[in-house]
Amino acid sequence: MAILTLGVNHTTAPVSIRERLAFPAEQLQSALRDLIDLPQVGEAAILSTCNRTEVYCELDGRDQRPIVDWMCDQRQFDDQDISQYLYSHFDAGTIRHMFRVACGLDSMILGEPQILGQMKTAYQAAREAGTVGKILTKLFHRTFAAAKKVRTDTAIGCSPVSVAFAAIRLAQRIFDDLGDLTAILVGAGETIELTARHLTENRIGHLIIANRTFDRAHTLANQFGGFAISLEELPKHLAKADIIVASTGSPLPILGKGSFESALRSRRHKPMFIVDLAVPRDIEPEVEQLQDVYLYTVDDLQHTVEENLKTRQEAALQAEEIIDLEVEHFLSWLRAQAATETIRDVRRQAELHRDAALQRALRELRRGKSAEDTLRWLADTLTNKIIHAPSSQIWQAGVNERADIVAAARELFQLKDPDT
């Protein structure tokens, strides 16, 4: 048995690769079922965010090739096109990696909290698909507990640092004052909600939220004093936008070059600041060719987030120490599973001997045999049944000069050293 992580993230693959490897929410269930159908896979979960796609599997063996082939087939990749971007971890490496990811230590912005919620969503999706069992369920729960401990015991999450926060910081560098500006947020998930909060805290003039589900946009707009529209209405409102932040789960771009050309004419080429946080992208890359447009993707934000690293280095070191302990705790549990199964089998075998002997003893009592004789027979029978197999194995170990087995048996049965 092995536990595998296989995936890509913002450090190993550009956005053009990550967007092709992303699994939209509506495709997760079928993808998980296809994955669990592989004969090598016992349990599986998929984490798919803007910055990473990772597959977690409990495998029979350590061959990751079937998982790579499955990923290529799912996302229409040739092996040579994807292998250079993939990373993998096994067992302790997987445990440590998942703990670090959940704590935000592997994120574009060190310590960002959103990833923990995304991992919980990934686990819930796998539960609903019926693809997680004892091992991954325990691992996810320990991952969540480790992340909680890190955030409680260190300062890793004290300041509001996230991709959304970095986007607003970038906007503040381009515009002196947000108070006279209009921002359109496309989507209504956690990233957009966080962006809306940061914009409101920085006193944005007007806020418009566009979403495929109007009710969700309306709820979010009410929360932050904004105005809700549907995605169908977005093109006619585009000219109002000084700032656009997009983060949906759409498999195809929502806004193209033509929409922005029209908006810029209406704005008389007043600049537009656009941040596309979605993977796959919500905004066609060709929009960047337009004058008076400042288009940034999640990859571009890397330069901004580097400024946040210095203040979190000490907290990150403390977090790594906590993770070291948590990894060892989980490994201890994992190592104990083989012993647990053996203990269960030994107990089951002993109970079978007990039940058989007890039934015979009860029959003898009903036939009038004395209780004392029956109890003596029962005690002798149980003793012989229980020690027969280990006694035979110990004797055979002596014949084969396996002193290690004999010594292990003395330790197992807590026998005193014969020389003392």
UniProtKB/Swiss-Prot annotation:
It comes from the Bacteria. NADP(+) binds at G187, A188, G189, E190, T191, I192. It is an enzyme of class 1 (oxidoreductase). Its EC number is 1.2.1.70. Keywords: NADP, Oxidoreductase, Porphyrin biosynthesis. The keyword tRNA-binding does not apply. SUPFAM superfamilies: Glutamyl tRNA-reductase catalytic, N-terminal domain, Glutamyl tRNA-reductase dimerization domain, NAD(P)-binding Rossmann-fold domains. One of its GO terms (molecular function) is glutamyl-tRNA reductase activity. It catalyses: (S)-4-amino-5-oxopentanoate + tRNA(Glu) + NADP(+) = L-glutamyl-tRNA(Glu) + NADPH + H(+). The record marks H97 as: Important for activity. Coiled coil: none annotated. PROSITE patterns: GLUTR. The active site is at C50. Substrate binds at T49, C50, N51, R52, S107, E112, P113, Q114, Q118. One of its GO terms (biological process) is protoporphyrinogen IX biosynthetic process from glutamate. The keyword Oxidoreductase applies. Pathway: Porphyrin-containing compound metabolism; protoporphyrin-IX biosynthesis; 5-aminolevulinate from L-glutamyl-tRNA(Glu): step 1/2. Homodimer. NCBIfam families: hemA. Possesses an unusual extended V-shaped dimeric structure with each monomer consisting of three distinct domains arranged along a curved 'spinal' alpha-helix. The N-terminal catalytic domain specifically recognizes the glutamate moiety of the substrate. The second domain is the NADPH-binding domain, and the third C-terminal domain is responsible for dimerization. During catalysis, the active site Cys acts as a nucleophile attacking the alpha-carbonyl group of tRNA-bound glutamate with the formation of a thioester intermediate between enzyme and glutamate, and the concomitant release of tRNA(Glu). The thioester intermediate is finally reduced by direct hydride transfer from NADPH, to form the product GSA. Catalyzes the NADPH-dependent reduction of glutamyl-tRNA(Glu) to glutamate 1-semialdehyde (GSA). Belongs to the glutamyl-tRNA reductase family. This is Glutamyl-tRNA reductase. It comes from Methylococcus capsulatus (strain ATCC 33009 / NCIMB 11132 / Bath). The lineage of its organism: Bacteria, Pseudomonadati, Pseudomonadota, Gammaproteobacteria, Methylococcales.
